[in-house]
């Protein structure tokens, strides 16, 4: 069973996502949120502050998923590391 452990100290979240049942992982630009869709229902994973762009964070999460999903059944995505990388590149 494929699982993602999503954690972020800045936003105080620790979430385990079962990828078997997921229909969609994406972002809502106007709300600056990252969400998942399970069986037609949308659940917000992360509400970001304006300086942390949901599009960029979501792209990094999807890249991590693509890079790890073929070789590992479960893996951790640390959103703090993604945010640090984004802000260091500014």
Regions found by a protein language model. Give the residues of each.
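Eukaryotic intrinsically disordered, low-complexity regulatory linkers and tails enriched in Ser/Thr/Pro
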Residues: 1-16, 20-90
């Amino acid at each position: 069973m494929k699982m993602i452990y999503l954690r972020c100290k800045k936003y105080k979240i620790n979430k385990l996502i079962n990828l078997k049942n997921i229909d969609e992982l994406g972002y809502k630009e106007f709300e600056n949120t990252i969400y998942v869709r399970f069986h037609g229902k949308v659940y917000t994973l992360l509400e970001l502050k304006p300086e942390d762009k949901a599009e960029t964070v979501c792209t990094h999460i999807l890249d991590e998923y693509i890079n790890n999903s073929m070789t590992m059944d479960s893996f951790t995505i640390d959103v703090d590391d993604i945010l640090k990388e984004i802000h260091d590149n500014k």
